[in-house]
Design a protein with these regions (language model features):
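Acetyl-CoA-dependent GNAT
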Residues: 2, 9-12, 16-68, 72-74, ...
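Conserved GNAT acetyl-CoA-binding A-motif
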Residues: 91-103
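Short beta-strand element of the conserved SAM-dependent methyltransferase core
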Residues: 42-45, 133-138
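Conserved catalytic-core motifs of GNAT/GCN5-like acyltransferases
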Residues: 98-100, 116-134
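Conserved acetyl-CoA-binding loop-helix of GNAT-fold acetyltransferases
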Residues: 71, 77-90, 110, 114
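Alpha-helical hairpin
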Residues: 4-7, 80
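Acidic helix N-cap motif at the loop->helix transition within catalytic regions
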Residues: 107
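Short, charged/polar, Gly/Pro-enriched secondary-structure boundary elements
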Residues: 140-142
Length: 142
């Protein structure tokens, strides 16, 4: 059974293990811990093990910005990122939700499109030669 919940400090090591798997180091440890402390980190679990996580904040022009959407490499293409996004569509503190990914990350672009996000713009010069594409969706009204 898959469930999505807010992360707690007890989850930090499992979350970091996934992040290290993906980026190769624990450079985001403090960022992730801070997100957990602010209740801005959610996890997707299946059979009591954490398969992915999402962090967000509301500092993007006052709107929710999904900053990290990370799924364990061996658990991808199974709907876990979509479960995290779906949770945010129901629980976002703001009506508008933004996120972004590199132009080279076609898999994440497909996830955004499959979840109803629209392309909203592009930022050059963050990663040399690999523009950042901004995506946007409006939270469904209750």
């Amino acid at each position: 059974l898959r469930n999505v919940t807010k992360a707690s400090n007890d989850n930090l090591d499992s979350i970091l293990h996934i992040d290290i798997d993906v980026i190769g180091d624990d450079s985001r440890r403090n960022y992730i811990k801070h997100a957990i402390d602010k209740e801005q980190c959610i996890i997707v679990k299946e059979d009591n093990s954490i398969l992915g996580f999402l962090t967000y904040d509301t500092n993007f022009f006052g709107y929710t910005f999904l900053s990290l959407i990370i799924v364990s490499p061996t658990k991808r293409r199974q709907g876990h990122a979509s479960s995290l996004i779906s949770y945010m569509l129901s629980n976002s503190p703001t009506q508008k939700i933004f996120s972004s990914t590199n132009e080279s990350n076609t898999n994440m672009q497909k996830v955004f499109k499959a979840n109803g996000f629209m392309r909203s713009g592009i930022i050059e010069n963050l990663d040399e030669g690999d523009p950042e594409i901004i995506f946007y969706i409006k939270k469904p009204r209750a």
